[in-house]
Each structure stands twice: as C-alpha cells, then as structure tokens.
Amino acid sequence: MPAFNVDEAHGLGVFGKQGRGVCDHFGVTEDIDLIMGTFSKSLASIGGFIAGDKEVINWLRHNARSYIFQASSTPAATAAAREALHIIKSEPERIQRLWDITSYALKSFRDAGFEIGET
C-alpha cells in the first residue's frame, strides 16, 4: 500500500483553515500518512516536526539516520514556535493580509510586463 507524505514547510501558516497547511486546504489530512514541516519559515523559529501514526513515529525515532546525534529543541525555540502557532490560529486576518499582498505583487509584476506564469 503506498504511503502519502506531505512536506508542509511552505503551506503551514499560509493555506487552509487557520493556516493548517495544504492538506487541510484540500481536505485530505486524513488520507496522509506523514505530515512534516519546519519551524524556520512561518513559525520564525528553529527545528521541525513529523506527524503520523504513533507506530510510524516510534519507528522513525529508533531507525532514521537523521535522528543520530540529534538534539532536542531548546525551550525558547519551542516556545517561539508554539506562540507563532497561537498567533496564526487566533489572528486569521494575517493570512488574509498575506494573500492580499501576494495578489497585489502578482498583478504588479504582470502589469510591468513580467511573465510569471500561472501561480
């Protein structure tokens, strides 16, 4: 059976209800086996995450090479990511403002004669 893994590095805080990412945006969260992402983009921190079934996460913890010599996140980095998640969830106008700025930038580039494709 195929496994579906989604990297939400660029979707978290941007897509979906309350910025939950592309899986939420397209309504497929329950169909995804692993969701991974980083804290260094929309959460303005360091570190990352992988979410999935408990058995899979435990297997990764014990067998993935990327865990060798891995250190835990610092309390400050964890607190920063947590607060950023709270802000994303409680201030949806920030996501709307992002999309307003994006639309303005795309229109401005097109009006200036740039070929930017369909985005």
Regions found by a protein language model. Give the residues of each.
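Active-site pre-lysine segment of PLP-dependent enzymes
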Residues: 1, 10-34
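Short glycine/serine/threonine/alanine-rich loop segments
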Residues: 1-2, 114
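General beta-strand structural signal in soluble alpha/beta enzymes
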Residues: 4-8, 36-37, 69, 118
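Fold-independent oxyanion-binding glycine-rich loops
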Residues: 8-9, 26, 38-40, 52-54, ...
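Conserved core segment of the aminotransferase class I/II
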Residues: 34-36, 43-89
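Conserved PLP-dependent catalytic core of the aminotransferase class-I/II
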Residues: 82-119
